[in-house]
Amino acid sequence: MAADQGIFTNSVTLSPVEGSRTGGTLPRRAFRRSCDRCHAQKIKCTGNKEVTGRAPCQRCQQAGLRCVYSERCPKRKLRQSRAADLVSADPDPCLHMSSPPVPSQSLPLDVSESHSSNTSRQFLDPPDSYDWSWTSIGTDEAIDTDCWGLSQCDGGFSCQLEPTLPDLPSPFESTVEKAPLPPVSSDIARAASAQRELFDDLSAVSQELEEILLAVTVEWPKQEIWTRASPHSPTASRERIAQRRQNVWANWLTDLHMFSLDPIGMFFNASRRLLTVLRQQAQADCHQGTLDECLRTKNLFTAVHCYILNVRILTAISELLLSQIRRTQNSHMSPLEGSRSQSPSRDDTSSSSGHSSVDTIPFFSENLPIGELFSYVDPLTHALFSACTTLHVGVQLLRENEITLGVHSAQGIAASISMSGEPGEDIARTGATNSARCEEQPTTPAARVLFMFLSDEGAFQEAKSAGSRGRTIAALRRCYEDIFSLARKHKHGMLRDLNNIPP
């Protein structure tokens, strides 16, 4: 009896919550200190540990679930179960090499008894209709990862177990190392730099000449180019002058601004800058090399382009001057010519009824400078001599540019236009120049390029035999001769009128 009492002294009587298949007592076994539900949630169980039987914990009572305490597994069986779980969870051997030791309490238990396993499955699979008040974890594997310290990793084990590889260069982004360039002679580099600077200067001149050509062909035909379109011009009526006498100063400033927009000064300055750049290019050192030849060829074509722009601008200006001179000649008569047509004598003037030649002179502006008095009194003569001066300066600049480009004196445009002033000499000299051109051949590269241009523009042909667009040089020559012819005819009459002005 004592033996029997000793055997059952430490036996544990099952509580009603645990249940028993036999209804009697069980041999001594080791149970967990926490119920299955608290053990799965890894929280402290609040079951009553003072009594012999395990009372249901407060959480299970609040949830209305059955509180079950499972048996502990033997240590040897626990180790085997842990090893089997690790192998089945991750077959990668690298995982075991780099994994930290796992505590035995964190591993899932393998309960062999059907009663315990059934009870655990019933507990882990609650009804879907119940609303859990805490976060549930579906699987034991997710719980075990907390013991590994990997719960904060988004990528699972790979975030800690995968080795960090260095960034290798992509074969598609690999850069080929450039071989060092051979050393360049300082003289060659200096010459190339000088040619590039000349090209920049030529490009700037070319752009300015292109803008001037646009202004001459589009804007100039809309306005007077040698007089200001002001109410104080000799073509304005006396009533118009009287109406605007109050705002004379404002109109004068406006007219002066409009007059300053005429690009004749810009054109001559651009031609002078082109001449300066061409002289610098002629004085530049010449080195035998492919790069130097290419740069010089580029500068040569740019310089020829600037020269052709000069020719076209001067031709357009000459045509515009001639058309407006003829318009002024046909529509207006100068005050001196009006006084000369009356031909009054000093005696007749004194005996007349208060009328004299002064009555034909228009009212003068209060701000009229002395230098503009001639254009105010005789606009036609002023326009003729202004046109002659413009053509003279323009052709002279063309001649200087041709000489700097290496064009022979008999092969340029300036040679086809005589500056002597006699039309007969112009025609004879032009014929002699054309025959000289036919005999001589251009020698320099610039001369050969210009020879092709002049041949295409009809410089060596008559105006009738020139092509549809090859009338530039012929038009310049024709306007030059007509303007100078009108100036010669008008010059003698102007001097005679000045001598016959009554005191």
From Swiss-Prot:
Name used for this protein in its record: Transcriptional regulator LovE
Gene3D superfamilies tied to this protein: Zn(2)-C6 fungal-type DNA-binding domain
Keyword Zinc: yes
Conditions for induction: Highly expressed during the first day of culture on solid medium; thereafter levels decrease but remain high. Expressed at much lower levels in liquid culture.
Subcellular location, record wording: Nucleus
SUPFAM superfamilies cross-referenced by the UniProt entry: Zn2/Cys6 DNA-binding domain (SSF57701)
Biotech relevance: Lovastatin acts as a hypolipidemic agent that works as inhibitor of (3S)-hydroxymethylglutaryl-coenzyme A (HMG-CoA) reductase (HMGR) which reduces HMG-CoA to mevalonate and is the key step in cholesterol biosynthesis. Lovastatin, simvastatin and related compounds are widely used to treat hypercholesteremia and reduce the risk of cardiovascular disease. Furthermore, statins such as lovastatin were found to be anticancer agents.
MF (Gene Ontology): DNA binding; DNA-binding transcription factor activity, RNA polymerase II-specific; zinc ion binding
DNA-binding region (UniProt annotation): 35-67
Gene: lovE
UniProt-annotated stretches for the region Disordered: 89-124, 331-358
CDD domains: GAL4 (cd00067)
Keywords from the UniProt entry: DNA-binding, Metal-binding, Nucleus, Transcription, Transcription regulation, Zinc
Principal place of residence: nucleus
GO cellular component terms, A-Z: nucleus
Function according to Swiss-Prot or TrEMBL: Transcription factor that regulates the expression of the he gene cluster that mediates the biosynthesis of lovastatin (also known as mevinolin, mevacor or monacolin K), a hypolipidemic inhibitor of (3S)-hydroxymethylglutaryl-coenzyme A (HMG-CoA) reductase (HMGR).
Biased composition (Low complexity): 339-357
Organism listed in the record: Aspergillus terreus
Pfam families: Zn_clus
GO biological process: nitrogen catabolite activation of transcription from RNA polymerase II promoter
InterPro entries in the cross-refs: Carb_Metab_Trans_Reg, Zn2-C6_fun-type_DNA-bd_sf, Zn2Cys6_DnaBD
